[in-house]
Amino acid sequence: MITSYIGYAVFYFTRKSFNFVMPAMLTDLGLQKADIGIMGTAFYLTYGVSKFLSGVLGDRSNPRYFMGFGLMMTGVVNILFGMSSSVFMFITLWMINAFFQGWGWPPCSKILNTWYSRNERGLWWAIWNTSHNLGGALIPILSGAVALYWGWRYGMIVPGIIACAIGFALCFLLRDRPTSMG
């Protein structure tokens, strides 16, 4: 559970990093608030579709690779976002990020249902469900501080690098069921 907890918390790093670098982006690139609105709308529409599709795909996949690959992809997208400058690329990349963001929850749900009995699930789901609070609480500090000292681009790139590293680790450390522990 610890591995999926950390992994899902880091999904929030790559989901919310944009929120904390956006003011600097507006100033640095001269973006309009409407551009930011389009990015947000495109993200949430794509994320909604992805949550449905990834639930179907996640049922047929090994959670460790599904979640790990999804997190690595959101990391790559955040890195590319930090290297981009055009509104078109921002929107495109943020939609790709949204698609892979949908890959976080289904494997976690599958793992929690596999690892814990009905009588235990309430407690473990409650504990696990704080993972997004942890990720959401840490990313403003991380992304904001990095953006303050090294610019908004690194405020996207650094969380992306962390996501790639944790996603890679998930592929080796996350276990889909107790029997896979040996």
Model-based region annotation:
Residues T3-K33, S54:
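Extracytoplasmic
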Residues V77-F81, N97, L170-C171:
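MFS-fold secondary transporters
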Residues L93-L134:
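Cytoplasmic helix-loop-helix junction between adjacent transmembrane helices
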Residues W128-T179:
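Helix-loop-helix hairpin linking two adjacent transmembrane segments in secondary transporters
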